[in-house]
């Protein structure tokens, strides 16, 4: 996989790293040498974003090193030995999925599709336009993808010997999207999501940091061109998936659908998100009461939000390609759980703490917490205009939890007003 000749240090080559990542079950992978060309710019933008208070109460994004640098400014701050990053993409889109932006049965909720994941038995299926067949069991994408990226890590160690390495799936002090962009997996859209030209933005990222150098040829290919956010392609850029590791052109062009669709104006500036206003942040990370100005615009979202991605033309294109390409290989460990697609608010409200733990064991939904989900359900009930939810909300107005109690009172007032 690299140069193992006498008196030479082992190095990574893009072709072999990508091949092994795809063999491990990822749909795409890219390799970038550290530091990468745009790292200083990206670090400055991250510092400015945090300083502006756009991280909300997410303290983990504000953690600093002993010398006062934000850990997530660049990977080399927490990991000074890091010389390269292998970034892998696993798609969780599915061609027959409904959209959060489409009309649904009244009284239904929306759980972000990344939290729908389950695995199908047997382990691999081929489907056309229908759903995969077989028994489904909940799956935790963190565990699924960490197992895959560690398999790649182990294979690298087998071939190249001892070196420093660290694998992460959503849990490390790194900005995965910046590394993915530098590795050529896509561009950062106006909704701040990584967009892969063929696969869209509905994907998980797994990162393997290593102390290995990237081969000189790969380093030359991986040097990003400057990205001025213009609709045109920067010099040296290519289409996503053609040569992972090259800078991918920003293909958002003049489109502003994501900005216009955001109900809480979290995307107030293109390519920037005010996380403190984002429905995903409010329903998952934010603890306690949710301000009325946000609650009234949260609609039926009870865990996360897909609106800015559901309106993105690149996601529609990726699903259309899947629909019309005949039988396609589906990631059997990341298929939707039917009961989490447009679930009934009554069902979510009826869960006690024990059934919540059982239903969402290993699921991202657990991050919101039992009471956090109830708070979100109360708000969705208030936005539903359905009087039948009033008795449940009445009971919650006496809840010990402040967030749930205030949400229930607000929801009741809203229902009675409507």
For the regions a language model picked out, list residue spans one by one.
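Short, charged low-complexity linear segments at domain edges
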Residues: 197-220, 224-228, 246, 274-294, ...
